[in-house]
Amino acid sequence: MSSDYTDRNNLASAIKTLGDMLEKDEAFQRLMYNASTKGEINRGRVNKVFLKALLSAGDKVGEFLNELIDHLNLFKVLGDFSWNPPVLKEAELNERTSQLRTQQHKYVERVSGFSHYGFGETGTPARGDITSPRGPQVASIEEDLATSKLAELLLAVGDHLEKIEKKGQFLPENVERFSLDCFITSESVKLSSEAVELAPCYTEPVIIQRSKEQTEKYCQEYVRSPHTSSHLLSNDKTQSIRIGQLFSPDSDGNTPKTVILCGDSGRGKSFVLEKIILDWVHLEHHFENFDAVFLLKYEELKCLSEEMSLTELLSRSCSLTSDQISQILQLTPEKVLFLIDGIDDFSFNAHIQISSPTDPSQKAPVISIIHCLMRDLLLVESSVIVTTRYTAAAELSSLCKRPQRFTEIEGFSERRVQEYFQKFFQDEQLFKKAYESMKTNETLLTFCSVPLLCWMVCFCLKKDADQVMTELKTTTSIYVHFVSTLLEDHHQSQSFLRSLGQLAEEGMKNRQNLFDEKSVTRTGLDPATRVFMNKIYLKRKKKHELLFKFKHLSFQEFFAALYYIMLDEEESWCKVSELFNMMESEALIHRSPPIFRGRLSNPIPSVMMFLCGLFNKKVSSSLFEKMKSTFSHNVKLKKKELKKKLMKMIPAMIRQYGFELFALHCLYELQDERFVTKVLETHKFIDLSNVSLRSTDCLVLCYCLRLCPNIRELNFMNCDLTAAKLKILQPALGLCETLRFSVEHLSEIGDLIQILSESKILRELKVREDEYGVESPRWSFNLSVTRGDVLLTLSSSEKNPSFSSVLNIRLTCAQSQISRTDWTLFLQRLRKTGTLTEDSSADDDHVSLQLSSLHSVGLKSLDLTLVSLNESWASGIISLIQNCTSLQQLKVSVTGLLLEEGLKLLKKSLTDPHCTVIIEGRRNCSEPSEEHLRQSYEKVEIHFKPKLLEELAELSICNPGSSALNIHCQSCVDVADSDQWVQVEPSVCRGEGGTEFRITTPAGRFQCSRTRMRWVCDGDVTLHYRAVDGHFLNAELERLQCERVAPVLDVNVISGKLEEAHLPHYMCLAESDPALTNAVKLLSVEDEGISLESVELTRFHAKILQPMFSPKTVLVKLGIPVKVHCDLLIFMTHTCPIILNVYFFPSDSLVEENIKTEEKSSHQIKCSRPEAPLQMKKQHSLEVPDAVVQPEAIKLRGNMKPNFFQVKQPVVNDITMILSRVDDQKSVWTGTIWKKLIDIKLNKTESDLFQSGQKHKTSQPAHSFDKAQFFDTHWCNLIKSVENVDTVADKLLQKQIIHEQFYSEIIHHKSTSEESMRKICVIVRKGSAAVKEIFISILLQENPNLLNHLPSSDS
């Protein structure tokens, strides 16, 4: 083998080593990437080019290559300095950096002596395979090499190292401590000799940026200052951001100068700051604008008692001198970033005089310097990131004057948990085994959203996966298992644990996190022990003081709680009681604004939570067993006493302080189902609105709600709920009647709708998209369930919608059908609808897909509000009608124009739809004339009805008259009530109990003109019904402490089936007490007794789904103020003097009938009824000028026979009446009976009583008899008695009682008088009472003696 071949083979091996190293070197790759983006190096071929250049150098490159590899290894160490701090000390770093810089210049000189292969004239590598070079180029080697990129590369490496060297001076002097503050190292727990480095394990947490409006709302409620957060960025939106976006500009280009990062314990706040400083050292582009970054730990600063300047303070945290720092602050203060970690107990009182330095060289107490930095009295041009727990965040935000951004750190998403597991276990098989087993435990997966807990779980899984999966259910259980494992490894004694707890407890009471060596020794701990604690060297003047701290503040809180239960019973209980008293006396809860409820910076609540967890015997037993102690017996004894205290304390937390979330966390840690149920048994409503809920909070809520027996309503508005969090809450949400919450996008509730559709408890679900979200429009979703039927409403907040937008959707369907469509997909399409334009080619397909989602729901009714009715929407509507046979009514309201293209398509296709279709909007006109232009903006309403309904309408001659719905209350005009009902007149007969009704209808929606009852049926149905005197219920009502607010109706379904029944009530829902809706019940009188159930109310009716009938009415609890719609009847009983009986009574057809029967010998005088509702059970007085009125006052009553005013008016004149409330003398109704009307009545009375000077001697009744009732009784006899049918038909046509076609059939057909009269009576029977009165009057006019020839009647 030739020497040349051997040298080249060795060279290739060396080059391969170099190539592998470069491929893996992150700093080198980042350098190459930066160069390639500037057009200097082709990144895709940089390594191949480098290797080709070295290959072409031949034998001469050997020595150079060896030196290069050696120093590139040094470069790797330097580049990774901040990732692996313990490797180099400062002196060694400076010496080796100097060596590299000397070698760098030698390389540049020597490279010019080497030939290279593969570079063209522009320095771009030639194409070709590296393994088969085309041969060396001999010509112009010196010139080519001088212009090659290899020299530039080495110079760039030098510059890179110089920057790293400079930035390394800003790192904390105690390099070892720098990487151990947030993560316990493997070395400290003696699992291996390697440290757990920050960079390889770091996993980015979820950070939420809050909008200005949301932050101001939270902070103003906390600080209560009109100037709160005035410097927040005005165009920040609530959204998730990454670390590199903390200083990104808002939509207006404004960049924040202060970033507040708040979050719960263990969420990774300190980690984020350390990652920022490492990214800055490694030249990450999002922090490249800063020339200096200083990290200040607030807990250490509080230990510095001497006064100093800011420059002196900063020099303690890095290797720069005060003079060097002073120069930086003076020359480029805008390029300085301060990272202030852990301001958890910040408070500022403007009335307390403290030193306020305004110059970096001015001396002051350290805490004053930090206050001035935060209050923008020092270095206003600089930037600040401050981390804090929740309660200090609001006050910090209110003090900062720089442009500010408010953020929260939530922890890991599920995807980030997986990423962290992979980094922790490194080995792919171990990772998969651990993560897949953990995923099956949803509770553990939820806890892993807290980064600190995630690390502890990984640590425990590595030691004993099976035990972890069965035992870890609470936060306390994770800490117990972690501590037990470490104690087992280190063989620590019981005294060690007690000493550790004593130190922690003393620190809790004194608000102390750092301990000197004397304090540690006093408790019996060996300062050399590093389990659970870290050492810190704090600069004090010219010496370093050794201090100790717990690995994490939460460990101090845990050990303090553990200490309490390790004491003897008397001392333990004394300290626990003291803990409770401290919580009350310091009024911690009072200082919490809504979003911070349950998230306190003070450690006492956390100690209390751990204490509750340790009193769970299953949790603490593993720790006690390893210690071989008798503590478990003490725990059992103390637990009984603790429960007594908790029974008093936890309800007080909720009732007095509104501190639900923390109380529920305590209950969760106990894991005692019977106890939790007992504590929460009285809770019917939980309101956590504006509390930012974490995944762990949702887990706690789900557990407690499932054990809350009487929970009825939840309010989770503005709680940052996501689909993942709703999934955790799902098992409990179905247990409530009323749910209110908000989400970022409605599509996140798609799965929840599917689940809740099966709930037998849910009555109302209200969801809206977060008001602080990024996107517009925002949608709201309302769902109500009544007796198996669902009313679903979707409303948009859009004020300037696009052409194809749908603004509102309102539908009804059976609850059992609601799960038959994919609501997630439907809601996603709904949001997309607003993004389409008039010319969008996707418009047709999208609208079709949107409406087709509703085909399978079993729609009963659908209301759409559209921007414009174009051909796409018309086509979609037609398809929906054709495919949804259950649809009974479809209404389309158009806010813009009804385009002719859409209308033509509808008219062509809907000649005989199976349901009623109503289109309303403004008519579009293509004519350019001025007149038509005006008409195009006129509102129109177009109806498409089934022919069957049109035929029914022709047969139903229903003039509402006095018996139909005639309520014009303006107070409740906005209360929902559908008016799309076909009004029908039933046949009437007299039974033993009074008037009864019978009717047969086809499928549709109908209203009885007599009783106002409504019903919905899918097919033919025959009903027999009547109004019942409700006095028989008075005893039961007294027992129930209720009053009736509706007639009592007894309905019998002879054939067919009713889908819905709507029973009339006379309450005014707008004017009554807001609690009325929940206090109303439907009463049913059954064979077994009475039953009560909830009922849905509309404006005038109580809605029952798929009713099973027996006598029913509507009740309301006594004591709730109720206003009702009232009717008025006035009867004149005497003419000289005039005596009037004036009745005010709830709108009840039976009551009206009974009054008229009682007053049948009197003369009714018409007067307008009260349009405003009147208060039930409230005294009212009637004032009539120049008249005597008795009694002085009456109450409006529903359960008893109506009372009335009697008015005596001696002089015939206009009679003005004023009804007023007695308590405040407020007038509620005014009416006038004109003198002329009274004269007419008086003359008519005389004419009725006397004809030709003598009284009627016939048996013919007076004209004041009830003609409608007379017809109902005698219509069979009238068929045989009336002969002049043609004349009667003439007058019926004239009065518009019959139509032209029917009139022709009577006149021209060769029928007998009896046959013609039978046809007329059939029509009249279906008419209203007014129709019957007109008919009898016509018969009497044509045949005055007719009544004498009929059998006598009781009527």
Curated annotation (Swiss-Prot):
Residues 977-1109 are annotated as: ZU5. ATP binds at G263, D264, S265, G266, R267, G268, K269, S270. Residues 977-1252 form the FIIND domain. GO terms for molecular function: ATP binding; peptidase activity. Expressed in adult spleen, head kidney, gill and skin and also in the embryo. Disruption phenotype: Morpholino knockdown in embryos 6 hours post-fertilization (hpf) results in reduced caspa and caspb activation following bacterial infection with E.tarda. It is found in: Cytoplasm. PANTHER family: NACHT, LRR AND PYD DOMAINS-CONTAINING PROTEIN 12, NACHT, LRR AND PYD DOMAINS-CONTAINING PROTEIN 3. Belongs to the NLRP family. This is NACHT, LRR and PYD domains-containing protein 1 homolog. It comes from Danio rerio. The lineage of its organism: Eukaryota, Metazoa, Chordata, Craniata, Vertebrata.
